[in-house]
């Protein structure tokens, strides 16, 4: 395991496919990928599970293995370290290139550890990505052992980031169990995602305009929450905005509860089945938020 991690070489190979036909794979060695997992895991554990970040930064929602769209986001927002980034999870599954996607993100995490941040999504969990594509991609292109190494890394990802004490960011949403930020800080890592409770909800819950208070979630996991839950949470914790991902939205971003919550989704033409745009939210020094949109590519006539 004495392989020295040549980050520069790894990043340059991952970026070499810019402008190539979308879908061209980058085949790193298994040792290099294992090295990315181990080194990033070390950094993730050295940083808190609840990140306290400063603006300016750019926030991105689900990527789901759409590697060429991730590259488009960086073309648009600036490649690190030109801008600071926070990603809200769901890097793997469903898309064709989960490996390239997660490898580039982990490489940037290692190289720019204080300016580049990755939260955990519900797909950064073995029981989910075992089913929705990542396991199969690891097995086909490398080994099951490598998939297990990724699991060990994902189990150490942080779950919440608060930007300038005002913007609460997580993958899914709020939890009926969440009364103090200290509860989040007390979650010990490494950890799997449980079937219920605080950590589960932060990664799985959804806002819902028809819910008053807390409701059942059609996903069969966690809850839905209404606008009033958002308002009370923000007031109680002196926050301005909840920023989350986890749901496809047509324009790439969508507000809820009178603009007190925003959903971001950064994978345009999701799975090739939707005509949605992807969006990235830029937060400036004054905490003004603006959106950069990746338009969906016109569907080619078959």
Curated annotation (Swiss-Prot):
GO cellular component terms listed in the entry, alphabetical order: cytoplasm; cytosol; nucleus; protein phosphatase type 1 complex
Entry-linked InterPro entries: Calcineurin-like_PHP_ApaH (IPR004843), Metallo-depent_PP-like (IPR029052), PP1_catalytic_subunit (IPR050341), Ser/Thr-sp_prot-phosphatase (IPR006186), STPPase_N (IPR031675)
Family: Belongs to the PPP phosphatase family. PP-1 subfamily.
Subunit structure: Interacts with Nop17l.
Cofactor binding: number and manner: Binds 2 manganese ions per subunit.
Keyword list, A-Z: Hydrolase, Manganese, Metal-binding, Protein phosphatase
Catalytic activity, as annotated: O-phospho-L-seryl-[protein] + H2O = L-seryl-[protein] + phosphate; O-phospho-L-threonyl-[protein] + H2O = L-threonyl-[protein] + phosphate
Keyword Aminoacyl-tRNA synthetase among UniProt keywords: no
Protein's GO biological process: negative regulation of BMP signaling pathway; negative regulation of smoothened signaling pathway; regulation of glycogen biosynthetic process; regulation of glycogen catabolic process
Molecular function terms from GO: metal ion binding; protein serine/threonine phosphatase activity
Binding site for Mn(2+) 2: 90, 122, 171, 246
Protein name: Serine/threonine-protein phosphatase alpha-3 isoform
Species per Swiss-Prot/TrEMBL record: Drosophila melanogaster
Catalytic center residues: 123
């Amino acid at each position: 395991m004495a392989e020295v991690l040549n980050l520069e070489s790894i990043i340059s190979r991952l970026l070499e496919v810019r402008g190539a036909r979308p879908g061209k794979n980058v085949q790193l060695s298994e040792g290099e990928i294992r090295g990315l997992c181990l080194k990033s895991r070390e950094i993730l554990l050295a940083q808190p599970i609840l990140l306290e970040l400063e603006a300016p930064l750019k926030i991105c929602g689900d990527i789901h293995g759409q590697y060429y769209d991730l590259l488009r986001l960086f073309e648009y927002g600036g490649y690190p370290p030109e801008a600071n980034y926070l990603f809200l999870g769901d890097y793997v599954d469903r898309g064709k290139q989960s490996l390239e996607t997660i490898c580039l993100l982990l490489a940037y995490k290692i190289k720019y550890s204080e300016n580049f941040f990755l939260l955990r999504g519900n797909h950064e969990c073995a029981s989910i990505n075992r089913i929705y594509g990542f396991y199969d991609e690891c097995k086909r292109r490398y080994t099951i052992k490598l998939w297990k190494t990724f699991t060990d890394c994902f189990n150490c990802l942080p779950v919440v980031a608060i930007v300038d004490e005002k913007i609460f960011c997580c993958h899914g949403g709020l939890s009926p169990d969440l009364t103090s930020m200290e509860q989040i800080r007390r979650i010990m890592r490494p950890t799997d995602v449980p079937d219920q409770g605080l950590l589960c909800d932060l990664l799985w819950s959804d806002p819902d305009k028809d819910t008053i208070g807390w409701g059942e979630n059609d996903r069969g996991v966690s809850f839905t929450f209404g606008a009033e839950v958002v308002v009370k949470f923000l007031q109680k914790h002196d926050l301005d905005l909840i920023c989350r991902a986890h749901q496809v939205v047509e324009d790439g971003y969508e507000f809820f509860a009178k603009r007190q919550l925003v959903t971001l989704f950064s994978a345009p033409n999701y799975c090739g089945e939707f005509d949605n745009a992807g969006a990235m939210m830029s937060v400036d020094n004054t905490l003004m938020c603006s959106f950069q949109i990746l338009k969906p590519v016109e569907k080619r006539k078959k």
